[in-house]
Regions:
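Active-site-adjacent beta->alpha loops and helix N-cap segments on the catalytic face
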Residues: 150-161, 193-196, 271-279
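Conserved, mostly hydrophobic/aromatic
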Residues: 49, 144, 183, 225, ...
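Short, Lys/Arg-enriched N-terminal segments with co-localized hydrophobic residues
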Residues: 1-10
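Conserved radical SAM core fold
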Residues: 108-112, 147-154, 188-192, 232
């Protein structure tokens, strides 16, 4: 196993960014905070203890899907420090299975002073020191999430500017520490807005982010963008096809994301597992850019596995089977080779 570690550790951040989004692979978001995983466990009647969190995550990280379909895993502070129940640390286990360990470094979205319904992401204080520690623990990439809600007056330019500035300062510090920053500006799908409103807001958000990244001298070749897809709000009465979602999403990326960015890994943002795979597949079917377009899913990869864990916490086989199926489906989507037929055949 050590050979793998040494190899990863000598790569520079541009090479790591490429490896994380290699064709047919994506990123597993397993960085739920203790509060968020509490909600997930509650829904399956599992007690939210450190041991249960470790058992569930370790089961995913040791699955054979890791080698084939997962390029990187985003961890939470608790998880990157944990020893597995079978010996090595969690980052060692992930490395051994061919993926790159990463860490969420933001401290959460906090109320934005002067705009009480919006948030700004905190976590810059002490970040330089924390990054050194995470590097020693094995992390080679990081994540920071900014959140924008759509409403009549939102997102405000205050929110778009504050979050863009924080994302850029974060990214600059991360590259200084020789790691890859995942830049995640999430325009939420909550609300009744239509797909065109999502397009327009996402355009403004991406523009501001890339302006700030340029000001802060971030090397875009060593970054990954984790954006939302261009989709209608969850309460929008006008439904749209996966084809339209793909067309508008790709168009928005082409117009607003600089060419140097090597990889774009979508968040699933509350889409169902199947929707998330189908939409990603449609985007890749028409992808005529140099971007490697893939997934960075949390629930989009874990929902079925969580259900299996709820049914029987001792049955790691069932949990791994559910996870392997989703990872494989999304691996296919990242190449534009997914189909409903394969979905059903594999699940049978």
């Amino acid at each position: 196993g050590l050979k793998v570690l040494k190899y990863t550790f000598t790569m520079n951040f541009e090479e790591i960014a490429k490896k994380m989004c290699a064709k047919g692979k994506g990123i597993l978001a397993a960085d739920e905070s203790t509060g968020t995983i509490a909600k997930r466990f509650k829904s399956i009647n599992v007690e939210n203890t450190e041991k249960n969190r470790l058992t569930f995550r370790q089961t995913l990280f040791s699955s054979k899907a890791m080698k084939d379909y997962i390029g990187g895993v985003i961890l939470f502070d608790e998880t990157i420090r944990q020893k597995t129940l079978i010996g090595p640390t969690i980052p060692d286990l992930i490395n051994k299975n061919g993926a790159i360990p990463g860490i969420k470094v933001d401290k959460g979205a906090k109320p934005l002073a002067g705009s009480k319904e919006e948030t700004v992401t905190e976590g810059l204080d002490g970040l330089r020191e924390r990054l050194k520690k995470y590097y020693k623990l094995g992390a080679r990439f990081t994540k920071w999430r900014a959140v924008y809600k759509i409403d009549d007056n939102y997102p405000s330019s205050q929110c778009i500017k504050s979050n863009g500035h924080a994302l850029a300062r974060y990214a600059s510090l991360v590259q200084e520490a020789n790691m890859v920053p995942i830049v995640e500006p999430e325009v939420l799908m909550d609300g009744p807005h239509d797909i065109d409103k999502c397009y327009q807001v996402t355009t403004n958000v991406l523009n501001e982010c890339y302006n700030e990244l340029a000001i802060h001298k971030v090397n875009l070749r060593g970054t990954i963008l984790k954006p939302n897809m261009i989709i209608p709000g969850s309460l929008c009465s006008k439904k749209v096809s996966a084809e339209e979602i793909a067309k508008k999403t790709l168009d928005c990326l082409k117009k607003n994301v600089p060419n140097e960015v090597p990889g774009i890994a979508f968040l699933s943002g509350g889409q169902s597992e199947i929707e998330a795979s189908k939409n990603l597949n449609e985007i890749n079917k028409i992808n005529d850019t140099n971007f490697l377009i893939t997934f960075s899913y949390g629930r989009g990869l874990q929902a079925s596995a969580l259900k299996a864990f709820g049914n029987d916490q001792k049955n790691s086989n069932a949990v791994q089977k559910a996870f392997e199926h989703r990872a494989k489906m999304n691996g296919l989507s990242s190449k534009g080779e997914w189909s409903e037929g394969l979905e059903k055949a594999a699940a049978a």
